[in-house]
Structures are given as C-alpha cells and as structure tokens.
UniProtKB/Swiss-Prot annotation:
This is Small ribosomal subunit protein uS19. Protein S19 forms a complex with S13 that binds strongly to the 16S ribosomal RNA. It comes from the Bacteria. HAMAP family: Ribosomal_uS19 (MF_00531). It comes from Ralstonia nicotianae (strain ATCC BAA-1114 / GMI1000) (Ralstonia solanacearum).
C-alpha cells in the first residue's frame, strides 16, 4: 500500500537540512546518511548522497529518473554470489 497523497513524501528532517545546505553551497562532498527510508525529492538532483547499506556508505548520484523513489533502493544490502554449479554438467 502506498503512502497517502495528502501526507506528502517522507524525508528525515536532518537529511533535508543537509541537502538544503549543500544546494546553496558549491561544496561537492557526498552527503552521508543512514536514512534509507527517505524519498528522493527534486531538490536532490545533481547531488551525491552516501547511503548506508549496513556495512559501508554507497555513493548514489541522484538523477531525474530517481525522483519519487527511496534512497535505499539504490544502495543494495545483499551480495549475490551466484547459484551453485550443476555437478552433472561438469562431466
């Protein structure tokens, strides 16, 4: 179930403050955040946000197509090593 339209998109207040400060300045350092649940707003376009994936901060460069999605969608938490090879096929 999606979020109600009258509530608006969710974004952590501390992240919004950092984004507004970065948009005004010319500093291109990534914004470090643990807030994977925050929705990407149009103000984020062109910024690099370092999203925590449980182990490290993954840099995510925000583009126009990402608006409306959550930050956590772009910082994967699980590494897929591949399925086990079929032993019969090796012979």
């Amino acid at each position: 179930m999606t979020r109600s339209a009258k509530k608006g998109p969710f974004i952590d207040a501390h992240l919004l403050k950092k984004v507004e400060a970065a948009a005004g300045g010319k500093d291109k350092k990534p914004i470090k955040t643990w807030s994977r649940r925050s929705t990407i707003l149009p103000d984020f376009i062109g910024l690099t946000i370092a999203v925590h994936n449980g182990r490290q901060h993954v840099p995510v460069y925000v583009t126009e197509n990402m608006v409306g999605h959550k930050l956590g969608e772009f910082a994967l938490t699980r590494t897929f090593k591949g399925h086990a090879a079929d032993k019969k096929a090796k012979r």
